[in-house]
Structures are given as C-alpha cells and as structure tokens.
Amino acid sequence: MKHYKCSLVLGKFCPLHKGHMLLIQRALEASDMVEVVVDNIMDEVIPVRRRMQWVKQQFPTAIVTTQEHPLPQDPSETTFFWDIWRDTLLRILPHPVDAVFASEPYGERLAKELSAEFVMVDLDRKSVPISATSIRKDMIGQWQYLSPVVQQDMRKVICVYGPESTGKSTLTRQLAQHYHMPYVEEFAKKVINEKNGDICYEDMETIVVGHHEAIVEALRQNTPLLFVDTDAITSKLWSNELFGKESPIIEEYIAKQRFDIYLLLDIDLPWVNDIHRYRPNERDVFFHQCEEQLVVRGRNYAIIRGKGKQRLSNAIEYVDRLISHSFNASGSARLESEK
C-alpha cells in the first residue's frame, strides 16, 4: 500500500464499531499521522465529546478533533455543501492531508476538495458486516461489533439489593435468564453454609472480598449486562446489625462497586425462613436503612414491588429503560427512582 504523510478519516462514530476500527487502522498503517474528525451533528444521539473520547482511547496515536458547529449532512441541503465542508476542514485540521480514507463513496469527492488521494476501505462491508444504525437499534444483539472501549463504556451492571426474604436471589437469576446474561450469586450464602449459619465478625471481610472478586471475574466475560445479587453496602449493614461494628475495608469495596442501577426490593413478600436469614421482624427497618445508604451515597436506584411475574416484569421495565438510555452523555443511565 502507498504510504502517506498525513491522512484524514471523517465519521460520526455513533457509536465507534469494528468497521470504524478497520478504517482508522488502515489509515494508521499507511500514514505517518492520521487526523480523525468526529462529526458534530444536530440532534446527536451520542454527544460528540463522548464519541471523541472513544476514538482517542481506542487510537491514542491519532489526532482527534471536531468542528465547532454541525454542518450539512447531504449535498441536497445546500448548493454550498462541499464548499462548507472543505473550508471547515481546512480551518480545523492542524496539518494538510494527502489522503482521505473512507468506507463511503463521499470520500472520493471530499478527497478531491482537499487535493488529496482517496483510499476506499471495505465499501461493501464484507470485512465487517455492520453499521452504526443497526447497533443503535439493537446494542445487545450487535454487541460483538462494538469497539472494546465502547463495550466498556456501555456495559451495564445491575445490583439486586434489599432486606432478607425479598426474592433477591430468585430475581437475579430470573433477570439473567430473561436477558441471557451472566449473574453473580451472593457470596455470603456460601460462607454462611460453610459455617452452618454461625458466622463471626471476621467472616464479614471474607464475604466482602470474595463477593467483589466474583464480580470482577464475571466482568471479564465482557457481556453487555451483568446482574449481581447484593453488594458491599449490604455487608456493611449486616456487620453493624450482627456485630455492632464493621471492617474498615468495607467502605473501600463500597467505593469500588459503582453499579448502574440498584433494584431495591420491597418487603411485600412473605417471610420464608432459612439458614441465611436472621431478622424476620426487622425487615421494614432494614429496608429503610438500605434505601438511606443509596440516597446518601447518591446511587441510582428503583424500588421493585409486586409478586411473582409482576415483580419480574417491574424489574425488567427498569433494566430496559437502562439499556435504552445507554447512549446518553455520561455513559450511565440515570433513571428517575421510584421512591
């Protein structure tokens, strides 16, 4: 392949996917430097600064920039379409370009306007059969085509949380089955079973560390969703409830566990006794303690009520909303909590 001094790649990267990665990588391999212009578009689904950050993280050697204001997207919008784009690019590009890499036919005309050579990459989408439009319509179904940095940014981790005997473990499994995604079981149950229900203060640290390690291990699967049964806040509350104190490391692990949403389960289910449960008459107090912890820490949460299929349906509604808000500015949905 011919080598170029400075090449241009222009795109929306909404979101950045493996087709875009192929395009930029080809430009990098054939150029001393590559300038990537992330198109600042009207009514953007994903803010331009977030899209720029994805490209910068995925390709740290590329020069990434954008235009200050949105520009026409089709020549039919104005007779000055190519003049506007040429003048804008010449103004914002730090270096003159001698090649334009693109996967769309427009690249040929753009290259001509910039007095550069045009390099077409995978026009027929044979190497990477995907489009950003199809990804936006079905992020989970097209997950494998997203760039690694976008996958990390878009992934949602949901914690099922609350007092005893509210169906946390059951709901966690049901959600995982519904979305065909992995889940993390409550590590405390393993410890309690091993101790035949007779746990001590020192076990709380084991529970917190073990549960967090299980979450980290599950995240390595790199799936779009992960469901987690309880968290370190739960261990904090139970440590104080059972032993009147807590290990200093618990707060450390609470800070590490930033879930996209907590599904706080209400106490509207009957008590079912088993070896893992201790306070049948204090669920109401514990529920309010659970909620208070989320409020003071600024955690995103929704209260889940209902029995049987209705409970699952209510939880699915919030998870679906979380998924639909995946492309907002922060990278993490902030739903209105039902309080």
What do the predicted segments below correspond to?
Residues T170:
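Conserved Walker
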Residues D198-K245:
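Conserved nucleotide-sensing/catalytic segment adjacent to the nucleotide-binding pocket
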Residues F243-Q310, E317, I323, S330:
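A glycine- and Lys/Arg-enriched "phosphate-lid" helix/loop adjacent to the NTP-binding pocket
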Residues G167:
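Conserved glycine(s) of the Walker
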Residues R173-E217, A315:
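Conserved substrate/cofactor phosphate-moiety recognition/catalytic segment
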